Amino acid sequence: MRGILLSIIGAAFCMGCVTAPQSRDELKTTAKNHPSMSIAETHTANRRFEDVAVTLQSKWRECYSVQVTTTRTTQSGMTTSRYRDSFHPRVRKVNNSLIEMTLQMTTEGMIMLSKVPEGGDYIVALDIVRLSGNKTRLDWYSSAWGWKDGWEAAKQWGDGKNVPCPTG
C-alpha cells in the first residue's frame, strides 16, 4: 500500500495540468482522456454477474479498507513529517445490471494543495456490468501509477480466482 501512496503522489506531480477529479465521473473521464497516465480498461469474466459482484465486493473491502502511516526522518533520526492516508472503499448498486465500486482516500497530517472532494480523493472507479449469458464486464478507471496490480487482481477475482490483495 505504501508503494501505491508514493505512486499517487508521483502521479500528482507528473499530471501538473490535470486537476484532481472532484467526482467519480470526472475520474472516469480523466482516465479515458489521459491514456498515458491512466488505466481505463475493460475485462469480460465468464461468470454470473451475482457471483462476480459478491467476490469483488468482499475483496474490495478486505483489501482496501486500510490506513497507511508515512513517517519521513532525516539521517540523524529526526522526524520531519508524519501523515496518515485512509482508504474508503464504497459499493453502490445502481440497478440489477450495474454495481459501482469506488475507492477514495483521505489524508490527515498533511496540507493538501488541491481541493479534496467530500469523502476523499477519487482513486479508483470499478463498474461491474451484467452481460448476456453468464458473462460480466468489469470497467476499471484509475491512475496508471501504482494501480496496475490492483486492476490485475480485480480481473482475477472477477474470473473466480482467489489471489491475494495487491501490495502496491
Say what each PLM segment does.
Residues 18-168:
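Ser/Thr-rich, low-complexity intrinsically disordered terminal regions
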Residues 8-11, 159:
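Processing junctions and N-termini across compartments
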Residues 6-7, 99:
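Compositionally biased amphipathic helical and low-complexity segments enriched in hydrophobic
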